[in-house]
Amino acid sequence: MKTPLTEAVSAADSQGRFLSSTEVQAASGRFNRAAASLEAAKALSAKADALVNGAAQAVYNKFPYTTQMEGSNYSTTPEGKAKCSRDVGYYLRMITYCLVAGGTGPMDDYLIAGLDEINRTFELSPSWYVEALKYIKSNHGLSGDAATEANSYIDYAINALI
């Protein structure tokens, strides 16, 4: 899994050199932000159920047809609603992984790589997940540096969807 730190080390090693002062400075900056990232990951994990349920409800409110149309990709049944919550939870989990890793590697490797194909195959609308992520961003309750760190990965996920 790639992170800015592993990328810097890999580049230096492949070139047979020590880390440059710029690379060391970037690593130092990451370590300075690490406490806020870990705080955000912990808070999002603790609130995961409430955030996921609220985000799913936000999708149903904005796109009421998702609870009215028949089909396995809609939320007309308890199973369909469970799938929606599972998918929203997966996005939230990837965000917490990115916060812990200090980079977008987990999301790039485990989510974004096949996102278009999955959405197309299962006829899932990216706008549903954008709405869910906007809800999470507006309701996570974080502030300060922890909010800044979390919001950067939420925005990254949103931008991958649009």
From Swiss-Prot:
Membrane topology: Peripheral membrane protein
Record key words, sorted: Antenna complex, Bile pigment, Chromophore, Electron transport, Membrane, Photosynthesis, Phycobilisome, Thylakoid, Transport
Any Pfam family: Phycobilisome
Residue ranges of the TM segments: none
One GO process term, biological-process aspect: photosynthesis
Source species, domain of life: Bacteria
GO CC aspect terms: phycobilisome; plasma membrane-derived thylakoid membrane
Subunit and partners: Heterodimer of an alpha and a beta subunit, which further assembles into trimers and the trimers into hexamers.
Stated role: Light-harvesting photosynthetic bile pigment-protein from the phycobiliprotein complex (phycobilisome, PBS). Phycocyanin is the major phycobiliprotein in the PBS rod.
Name assigned to this protein: R-phycocyanin alpha subunit
Species of origin: Synechococcus sp. (strain WH7803)
